[in-house]
Amino acid sequence: MATFTDAEIDELFETSGTVIDNIITAQGKSAETVGRSAIPHGKTKALSAAWEKHGSIQPPASQDTPDRQDRSDKQPSTPEQATPHDSPPATSADQPPTQATDEAVDTQLRTGASNSLLLMLDKLSNKSSNAKKGLWSSPQEGNHQRPTQQQGSQPSRGNSQERPQNQVKAAPGNQGTDANTAYHGQWEESQLSAGATPHALRSRQSQDNTLVSADHVQPPVDFVQAMMSMMEAISQRVSKVDYQLDLVLKQTSSIPMMRSEIQQLKTSVAVMEANLGMMKILDPGCANVSSLSDLRAVARSHPVLVSGPGDPSPYVTQGGEMALNKLSQPVPHPSELIKSATACGPDIGVEKDTVRALIMSRPMHPSSSAKLLSKLDAAGSIEEIRKIKRLALNG
């Protein structure tokens, strides 16, 4: 096993401290993020306090090792010595609790600037590991997102497990300086979880393996069911309205036919009114009456039976009898009450009087009515009188 002298050990301490300071103070390209910072919510204040504490501890560290700074200026660091990237990382499970961290602060004051810097990096890695655990255990979007995050973090763990094996093969003699290399692995892990900081190198991992917080994922839509039920109700109402509209259309399809029938009825009623206006109900006993006033005048003339004392001698026969008619009127000659039995037939005179009254009441031209009256006077049979009557009605 190789042995180192005190001077070589001092050189190793000086070189590792210089490399760590160069890494911290290097102005590299900041890690790129898409949309929002990769720093977990609520960790900004803790990180700022840690950097302020580191700034307050840094000056005494530079005062304790002035000779190491001079040696580092004379001897540049070799690639074999500056191999902190292959150091084994310390996981969150290997970190001491809070009381152990307080004891480490006391030892940091005794061991110098390097151990104080590494202890500060240990605290940052603890906070970043706790932030990762909080993201893995938060039930934001269900079980289907957790396997994706765990699968994305498996390649990074595999890389961190391969690095300690390479480091052991390359530098088996770094038994006394295992704290330097181990804690630098934690600093590299904290860089990957903390995101873009003013003095952090760009993460070597791809963005596909970076853990993403699910805080800003859109929540599930709770009102979709209500919208679906509302749409179903609306569709049912629309179907009912459509059915009722079909019924209305069926009823309205018969409206044109009804209109035509109503028009025909109106025409028929008009014709009937015209015919009734041209026709008159004639009194058979008053055929020559053509107006209501004339009919009333005829109705006033009626026989009157005078009772009381009178001279009945003109009506008394030789046998002392008096003949009375149907109206109980005395008849001077009883033979008038006896009528000869003749053949019953239409009375031509009455028919002529009826047709004459009809011709005179019709609104006809005077020449036409005169011709009909002359024909009526010349008619000698019932058939001729009926023909003249038809001509008068047809106008």
Curated annotation (Swiss-Prot):
Keywords: Phosphoprotein, Viral RNA replication. It comes from the Viruses. Residues 89-101, 129-180, 203-212 have a biased composition (Polar residues). Residues 65-74 have a biased composition (Basic and acidic residues). Residues 222-285 are annotated as: Multimerization. Residues 29-104, 129-214 are annotated as: Disordered. One of its GO terms (biological process) is negative stranded viral RNA transcription. Belongs to the rubulavirus/avulavirus P protein family. The N-terminus consists of a long intrinsically disordered tail. The central part contains the coiled-coil multimerization domain (PMD). Forms a four-stranded coiled coil structure. The C-terminus constitutes the alpha-helical domain that binds to the nucleocapsid (N-RNA complex). Homotetramer. Interacts (via multimerization domain) with polymerase L; this interaction forms the polymerase L-P complex. Interacts (via N-terminus) with N0 (via Ncore); this interaction allows P to chaperon N0 to avoid N polymerization before encapsidation. Interacts (via C-terminus) with N-RNA template; this interaction positions the polymerase on the template for both transcription and replication. Essential cofactor of the RNA polymerase L that plays a central role in the transcription and replication by forming the polymerase complex with RNA polymerase L and recruiting L to the genomic N-RNA template for RNA synthesis. Also plays a central role in the encapsidation of nascent RNA chains by forming the encapsidation complex with the nucleocapsid protein N (N-P complex). Acts as a chaperone for newly synthesized free N protein, so-called N0, allowing encapsidation of nascent RNA chains during replication. This is Phosphoprotein. The gene is P.
